[in-house]
């Protein structure tokens, strides 16, 4: 049994831009259908299949709801498997990363919750810009390198956004 395309599980065509609210509604509908508890009285084989379907659905949903994971997945199904770990040759973005990290460290040292809020808004704008840029080029074979570079930038910003949320929680306590 092969793993079905994440998009096919949700009756979607591969695309970067998705309505995440509709995706969540469809996920809940499908999750109810394949939930292992519904198969408690079924045969062992049917229970195993239900568990596998539930796990595949959860993985597909987690992938599609995350912009960086969705970008990586789109590149992979397009035949451009992206290695997890590579040396990034993007000096401008590396410099930007260092500046963001320094700024976040200063906000933490100063316990500046308002400043963190402003930083978070700027980060969201940067993420939205990357998402738009990726959406415009991911399915163009001539722009695969650009799409991969944008996907890696998305991954960094996603990780930075998680760190910002954690800092917000610490400062808010």
From Swiss-Prot:
The keyword Chaperone applies. It comes from the Bacteria. One of its GO terms (molecular function) is ATPase activator activity. One of its GO terms (cellular component) is iron-sulfur cluster transfer complex. Co-chaperone involved in the maturation of iron-sulfur cluster-containing proteins. Seems to help targeting proteins to be folded toward HscA. NCBIfam families: hscB, PRK00294.1. Interacts with HscA and stimulates its ATPase activity. PANTHER family: IRON-SULFUR CLUSTER CO-CHAPERONE PROTEIN HSCB. Belongs to the HscB family. This is Co-chaperone protein HscB homolog. It comes from Pseudomonas entomophila (strain L48).
């Amino acid at each position: 049994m092969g793993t079905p395309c994440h998009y096919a599980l949700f009756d979607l065509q591969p695309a970067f831009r998705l309505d995440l609210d509709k995706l969540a509604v469809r996920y809940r509908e499908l999750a109810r259908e394949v939930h292992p508890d519904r198969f408690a009285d079924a045969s062992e084989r049917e229970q195993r299949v239900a568990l596998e379907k539930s796990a595949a659905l959860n993985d597909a949903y987690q992938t599609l709801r995350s912009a960086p994971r969705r970008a990586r997945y789109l590149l992979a199904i397009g035949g451009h498997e992206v290695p997890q770990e590579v040396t990034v040759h993007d000096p401008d973005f590396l410099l930007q990363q260092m500046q963001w990290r320094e700024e976040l460290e200063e906000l933490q040292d100063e316990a500046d919750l308002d400043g963190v809020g402003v930083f978070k808004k700027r980060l969201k704008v940067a993420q939205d810009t990357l998402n738009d840029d990726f959406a415009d080029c991911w399915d163009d074979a001539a722009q695969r390198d650009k799409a991969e570079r944008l996907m890696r930038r998305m991954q960094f910003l996603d990780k930075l956004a998680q760190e910002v949320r954690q800092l917000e929680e610490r400062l808010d306590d």
